C-alpha cells in the first residue's frame, strides 16, 4: 500500500472505519470461503482492518495470522481478536508455503492495478499446495483516489486480463455482490476464490 493518503485516511478515520465494518454480518462469504478448506486450516487475514474476519475464523476453530498496513487498525484488531496483529505493508510480505487459506477482503484493492500481479503472485507463493485465496474488489473500471483512499476497481473481464501472466491458480468461484454495510445503496463488489493447483 504505497499510497500514503490511504494509510493517512485510516489513521484519521480509525474509529469511523471500525464502527462501519466490525459488526457487519459477513458470514455467508466467510462460510463459503471456509467450505473450500480442510478442517483446522491455517489462515492468513491479509489486510485485516478492524479484525472482524480474523475473530470469526478464530471463533470457528481456525489458526489465524493477521496483518495490516495501518498501525492504528493493528492496535484495534489486536484488542478485538485477542491475537497479536502484525503491522506490515503489503509490499513487505514474503512468505512461502505457509497457509492453507488467505483472506484478502477489500485489502489489495488499495494497490495500483500494475502492482496487483506481483502481489497476487506473492500471495500464491505463501499458499500451500491446494491452498485457497479469497479476494474482493469494488466492482467497476475506476482506478485512483476516491474519498481519501486509493482504489483499483475490477470487473470479471479486467480481473481475467490481470491474471493472464499469473499461472498455477484454478478459479473456484467469481461472483458479484451488493455492499452489506448500511447506506451503501447500489455499490457492488467483485468476489474471487482461487485455488493453488501447481507450484511455480
Question: What are the residue ranges of the model-derived segments?
Answer:
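A conserved beta-strand element that flanks and buttresses the S-adenosyl-L-methionine
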Residues: 103-104
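Hydrophobic adenine-recognition pocket in adenosine-nucleotide-binding enzymes
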Residues: 107
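Conserved acidic residues
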Residues: 100
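Class I (Rossmann-like) S-adenosyl-L-methionine-dependent methyltransferase catalytic domain
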Residues: 1-97, 114-118, 122, 132-200
Amino acid at each position: 500500500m504505497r499510497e500514503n493518503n490511504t494509510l493517512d485516511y485510516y489513521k484519521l478515520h480509525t474509529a469511523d472505519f471500525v464502527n462501519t465494518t466490525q459488526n457487519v454480518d459477513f458470514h455467508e462469504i466467510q462460510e463459503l470461503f471456509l467450505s473450500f478448506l480442510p478442517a483446522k486450516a491455517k489462515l492468513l487475514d491479509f489486510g485485516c482492518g478492524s479484525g472482524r474476519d480474523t475473530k470469526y475464523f478464530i471463533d470457528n476453530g481456525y489458526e489465524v495470522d493477521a496483518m495490516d498496513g495501518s498501525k492504528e487498525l493493528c492496535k484495534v484488531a489486536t484488542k478485538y481478536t485477542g491475537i497479536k496483529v502484525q503491522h506490515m505493508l503489503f509490499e513487505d510480505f514474503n512468505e512461502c508455503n505457509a497457509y492453507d487459506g488467505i483472506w484478502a477482503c477489500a485489502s489489495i484493492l488499495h494497490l495500483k492495478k500494475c502492482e496487483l500481479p506481483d502481489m497476487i503472485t506473492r500471495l500464491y507463493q505463501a499458499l500451500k499446495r491446494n491452498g485457497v485465496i479469497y479476494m474482493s474488489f469494488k466492482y467497476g473500471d475506476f482506478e485512483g483516489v476516491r474519498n481519501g483512499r486509493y482504489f483499483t476497481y475490477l470487473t470479471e473481464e479486467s480481473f481475467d486480463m490481470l491474471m493472464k501472466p499469473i499461472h498455477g491458480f484454478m478459479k473456484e468461484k467469481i461472483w458479484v455482490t451488493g455492499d452489506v454495510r448500511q447506506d451503501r445503496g447500489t455499490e457492488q463488489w467483485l468476489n474471487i476464490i482461487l485455488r493453488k493447483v501447481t507450484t511455480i
